[in-house]
């Protein structure tokens, strides 16, 4: 097994299994009520069960969740430098590390809204 295998991002095949586990998890009801008030839990289960890729999850679930958090908890988000990202090249993006989960999620939204490929994120267990 790869040295970092336990913290690497899911492949699409692994993600499909994870989406089904999420749909069946007993915590899905309170999570749904929090992130999508008014959405019937069965609709969330159906959505999660229909996802086929990490991209689907980012586009159909997380985008709405993160933009809702931004609207409800900030006066706005500012950024600069996206014009420096070159297609086909890898880049390292660094935030000020206020929130180990939310910072990269907001970066994903900014990339998505600017039609830049989103990133893969791994979080070490020493940071959780």
PLM features per residue range, with description:
Residues 1-91, 97-108, 112, 118:
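Membrane-anchoring hydrophobic helices of lipid-metabolizing enzymes
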């Amino acid at each position: 097994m790869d040295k970092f295998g336990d913290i690497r991002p899911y492949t699409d095949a692994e993600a499909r299994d994870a989406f089904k586990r999420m749909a069946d998890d007993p915590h899905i009801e309170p999570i749904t009520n929090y992130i999508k008030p008014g959405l019937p839990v069965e609709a969330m289960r159906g959505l999660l069960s229909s996802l086929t890729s990490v991209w689907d999850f980012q586009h159909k679930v997380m985008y709405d969740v993160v933009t809702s958090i931004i609207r409800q908890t900030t006066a706005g988000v500012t950024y600069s430098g996206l014009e420096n990202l070159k297609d086909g090249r890898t880049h390292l993006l660094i935030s000020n590390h206020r929130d180990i989960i939310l910072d990269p999620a907001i970066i994903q939204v900014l990339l998505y809204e600017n039609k830049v490929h989103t990133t893969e994120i791994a979080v070490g267990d020493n940071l959780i």
